[in-house]
Amino acid sequence: MKANIHPNYHKITVVMTDGTQYTTRSTWGKEGDTLNLDIDPRTHPAWTGGSQTLVDRGGRLSKFKNRFGNIGM
């Protein structure tokens, strides 16, 4: 491997939507940072059968609906 081309790999704490925490290694953030998830495997519609509502992060879902909402099948 070449030296000094890879990102810093360190431990972070991940907090799931139900409050469960675990420590993992990642290139995200800095050593000791906490990553709070908006959606995780326990709440993601793909894994729960679509029973959960979608989280509109930054208005992306609204923007999509405004742009493509009038297209019918």
From Swiss-Prot:
Residue spans crossing the bilayer: none
HAMAP family in alphabetical order: Ribosomal_bL31_1 (MF_00501)
InterPro entries in the record: Ribosomal_bL28/bL31-like_sf (IPR034704), Ribosomal_bL31 (IPR002150), Ribosomal_bL31_A (IPR027491), Ribosomal_bL31_sf (IPR042105)
GO cellular component: ribonucleoprotein complex; ribosome
Protein species of origin: Bartonella tribocorum (strain CIP 105476 / IBS 506)
UniProt-recorded name of the protein: Large ribosomal subunit protein bL31
SUPFAM superfamilies referenced in this protein's UniProt entry, alphabetically: L28p-like
Described function: Binds the 23S rRNA.
Family that this chain belongs to: Belongs to the bacterial ribosomal protein bL31 family. Type A subfamily.
Subunit details: Part of the 50S ribosomal subunit.
Disulphide bond pairs: none
Gene Ontology annotations of biological process type: translation
